[in-house]
A protein has these predicted regions:
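Membrane-embedded alpha-helical segments of integral membrane proteins
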Residues: 48-96
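Alpha-helical transmembrane segments
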Residues: 41-52, 78-81, 103-110
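N-terminal signal-anchor transmembrane helix
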Residues: 98, 106-172, 189
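Soluble catalytic domains of enzymes that build or remodel membrane lipids, polysaccharides, and related
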Residues: 151, 157-171, 180-372
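Structural signal for the C-terminal ends of transmembrane alpha-helices
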Residues: 94-102, 371
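Internal catalytic or translocation cores that form aromatic/hydrophobic pockets or channels
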Residues: 175
C-alpha cells in the first residue's frame, strides 16, 4: 500500500513537470501563405518545364500531320528537327519532376514515348549488311565486278565545295558511284583537274537552268543515260544504269525543292513527283542526293512507300545529320541527304564526312544489290 502511494506521488510530480515544460515552450506557429508558396527557383523551373513540354508536344503533333498539312508554312522546318525535340522532352520531364509539375511531366512522357517509337528503328537493323559486303569494300581499290559498292552523295553548294577533297574522299573510301548536286561548269572542270576521272571516268551531268546542275560519276559505264529520270519540276535528276555483278542498277542524282518561304507547296510537289517512281518496275533503283526532307517528313515517307528504303534507317547506323555545316556554333541537326535503295537491297557502313566549301556534309553508304 505504501509502495502504491509513493508511485502515485511520483507520477503526479512527473505530470506536473511535463505540463509546466509544455507551457514554457512556445507554441508552433502555422505556416504563412508566403511560406507555402513554391520557392522562386522552383517556380522558374516549373515555367521552363511547361514551355519545353508544350514545344515538344507541338513538334510531335507537327510530325504526326498528314503530308498535305506538312506543306503549311514553316512546318517542314520544324519537323526537320524532330529528333532534337525528343531531347527537349527529356529535359522538360526532368524539370517537371523537380518542380512537381504533373501535367507537364505527363505531356513530356507522352511526347518522348511517341518520338522514341518513331526514331528507334534508326538504331536497330533488321537486315544487316553481310560480311561479304564489308570485305568487298575493304580492298585498296574498288572492285567493280561484284554486287557490292561504296556510294557517295554530296551537295556541292553552288559549285563552291573543295573539288580536291571530294576526289580524295572518293579515293580513300573506294567510291564506285558518286552523286553530286548544285554543280556548275566551273566546278566540274575543277573536279576533272583534281583527278576524278582516275577513279570515276564515266559521268552524266544535266542542268535545268543552265547554271546549277546535278550529276553522276561512276567507275563503270553508265548505260541508258538520261537528263531527267523523274521529270521533276525542281531540277533535272540525271540517271544511268550500272552493272553490279550482273545486276543492272539504275542510279539517280536527286535534288528536290528546298522548303523556304514561297516554296512550301513546290517542296511537297517535288517529293510527290519522286513518289511516282514506285510504279517504274522495269528498273531497280538507287536514289542519292539532297532530298530537302528527313524521314520525319510525311511526303518523304510517301515517296518511299512499301518499295524504297532509306539506307540510314535500315542499316541501324543511327542518325545521319548532314546539314548545316557552315553555321558557326550550330551543329548539323537535319538528315536531309539520303541514299535510298530498292526493295531486296541492303545497306550499311553509313558515314557522314564534312568537306570544305559546302553547307552540306557528304553521305557515304555501302550497298548490297543482290536480291535478298
Amino acid at each position: 500500500m505504501a509502495r502504491a502511494t509513493s508511485a502515485n506521488k511520483r507520477n503526479a510530480y512527473r505530470g506536473k513537470r511535463t505540463a509546466a515544460a509544455a507551457k514554457s515552450r512556445p507554441s508552433a506557429k502555422p505556416y504563412t501563405k508566403e511560406q507555402l508558396k513554391p520557392h522562386k527557383k522552383h517556380r522558374f523551373l516549373g515555367f521552363l518545364a511547361c514551355v519545353f513540354a508544350l514545344l515538344t508536344l507541338f513538334a510531335t503533333a507537327a510530325r504526326a500531320l498528314p503530308a498535305d498539312l506538312q506543306e503549311l508554312p514553316y512546318v517542314p522546318i520544324l519537323i526537320s528537327a524532330t529528333p532534337w525535340f525528343m531531347l527537349l522532352g527529356l529535359i522538360a520531364l526532368l524539370l517537371a519532376i523537380v518542380s512537381r509539375k504533373i501535367l507537364a511531366a505527363l505531356i513530356a512522357i507522352a511526347a518522348v514515348a511517341l518520338n522514341g517509337y518513331w526514331q528507334y528503328p534508326f538504331f536497330y537493323s533488321t537486315t544487316p549488311l553481310p560480311q561479304a559486303a564489308h570485305n568487298a569494300v575493304a580492298y585498296n581499290e574498288a572492285n567493280t565486278s561484284d554486287a557490292f559498292a561504296r556510294v557517295m552523295t554530296f551537295n556541292v553548294y553552288k559549285g563552291q565545295a573543295d573539288a580536291q577533297s571530294i576526289v580524295e574522299t572518293v579515293r580513300d573510301q573506294r567510291v564506285e558511284v558518286l552523286a553530286l548536286q548544285e554543280t556548275t561548269d566551273g566546278f566540274v572542270k575543277k573536279l576533272k583537274d583534281a583527278g576524278i576521272e582516275r577513279y570515276l571516268p564515266y559521268s552524266n551531268i544535266s542542268s535545268s537552268d543552265g547554271v546549277y546542275g546535278n550529276g553522276l560519276w561512276s567507275a563503270t559505264p553508265l548505260a541508258q543515260p538520261v537528263d531527267d529520270e523523274v521529270n521533276s519540276s525542281a531540277s533535272f535528276m540525271p540517271a544511268g544504269t550500272v552493272d553490279m555483278g550482273g545486276n543492272s542498277i539504275r542510279f539517280v542524282s536527286v535534288h528536290t525543292t528546298a522548303p523556304v518561304p514561297g516554296y512550301w507547296r513546290q517542296w511537297k510537289r517535288s517529293l510527290d513527283e519522286l513518289g511516282l517512281m514506285q510504279s517504274h518496275t522495269d528498273n531497280r533503283y538507287i536514289f542519292m542526293g539532297d532530298f530537302n526532307a528527313t524521314y520525319d517528313h510525311a511526303p518523304f515517307r510517301e515517296f518511299l512507300g512499301t518499295r524504297f528504303y532509306d539506307a540510314a534507317r535500315i542499316s541501324g547506323h543511327g542518325f545521319t545529320f548532314s546539314w548545316p555545316t557552315n553555321r558557326p556554333g550550330l551543329p548539323m541537326f537535319a538528315g536531309i541527304d539520303h541514299v535510298v535503295v530498292d526493295q531486296g537491297m541492303t545497306a550499311g557502313q553509313c558515314k557522314v564526312v564534312k568537306i570544305a566549301g559546302s553547307d552540306h556534309a557528304a553521305l557515304l553508304v555501302t550497298v548490297d544489290v543482290m536480291q535478298s
